[in-house]
């Protein structure tokens, strides 16, 4: 089969910075909260290798005006001005990227909607709500067909005992297209494995499309295929019959990536290592 090709990376206009812990280093774009690459113990995993400038707010494409600030060795902050007058979007959002041990944390730490929106009160036009934020396209971690043993493993909700909700996909060139929601997602090479957690409450439908807080995408870059794990869309302000939801329903968007070498000492790296490491970033139900 013929090899696939895509747009090559042009980093001539990108300024990168580095944030790191004692074990993990992340190369980040100063113009957008995007990780280009991770390094752990001399081995690398790609993040989002192609430049990004847009996000989706209320399903409208916005090119935010971004101010970058490096807080310290481990942490960087992005102030993103979201403006789209004809669609009533007038908000500021702060995004923090932070490396903690072998994890990267992607956190929206503050959202200010300059429209008049009062929780529990009437709203005259629901378009004034900042209802959804979507960084789709911003792969939090990925693998490339150029890497030995590159694989994506994902799990969806399966209520049918005869049908597995699991996908095990080798990342090759060529390969089938992939754009699918998952509850759990891992990428691995023969050296490193990574898992991603998000507090997105996204659903692409019922059944196995439910609780799809992660989205996996294939992207062809140059001569290589990349499969990356993205957070699905986040919800923020909502209204029902013209009444804005109460404040307590709002949860600031958050995602975490964990990267590991062989974690179960079986002398190979695969999704199981990512799954073991994932326990350190998963959101445990209260009482567990």
Explain the meaning of each model-derived region.
Residues 1-9, 15-288:
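Carbohydrate-recognition beta-sandwich/jelly-roll modules
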